[in-house]
A protein has these predicted regions:
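Bacterial N-terminal signal peptides that target proteins for export
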Residues: 1-9
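Alpha-helical transmembrane segments
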Residues: 11-15
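C-terminal motif of bacterial Sec signal peptides marking the signal peptidase cleavage site
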Residues: 17-20
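Short metal-binding segments enriched for Cys and/or His
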Residues: 115-123
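Short, highly charge-biased, low-complexity peptide segments
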Residues: 124-130
């Protein structure tokens, strides 16, 4: 009896590992328009150029980072977002860099009216379109770290 229980136990254990692995079926997370650039940024909130990030509702744009820049937004001093400024529904081109009037990022390409919330990166009117590409962001004291 002991010898039949051991293989059964291992089979159950292996099956539970296999079925517990999640699969992300949302095709919007596999955006063919944007690459994953290497991002590793530290922001010191004591520096004047990042002072706005000490207050909820404010944002700072990091030019020269990511693909077309990164917008960092203070949601509530505990939650920050860092999002790519290249419109996720266009391959990067001359007009794909979005402009920001918090809390909205707008694509200036004349062919559409893509607008996104910088609070969560979602398209303002069409949730079937790709959302803005997020970066990991962590605040520790007066330091904000942005990575991917």
């Amino acid at each position: 009896m002991k010898s039949t229980m051991k293989p059964f136990f291992y089979s159950i254990l292996i099956a539970s590992f296999l079925f517990s692995c999640g699969k992300d079926d949302d095709p919007r997370n596999n955006n063919p328009n944007l690459t994953d650039p290497i991002v590793n940024i530290s922001l010191n909130l004591n520096l004047p150029q990042y002072d706005a990030l000490k207050f909820p509702g404010n944002s700072v744009i990091l030019n020269g980072e990511g693909i077309r820049g990164i917008v960092v937004y203070n949601v509530n001093n505990d939650l920050y977002t860092a999002l790519e400024l290249s419109d996720p529904n266009h391959p990067p081109n001359d007009c794909s860099r979005m402009t920001v009037a918090a809390p909205i990022a707008t694509c200036p390409c004349g062919s559409d009216t893509n607008e996104y919330f910088i609070t969560d990166g979602q398209h303002r009117t069409d949730n079937t379109l790709y959302p803005m590409q997020p970066y990991r962001i962590v605040r520790t004291g007066d330091q904000i770290r942005i990575t991917n």
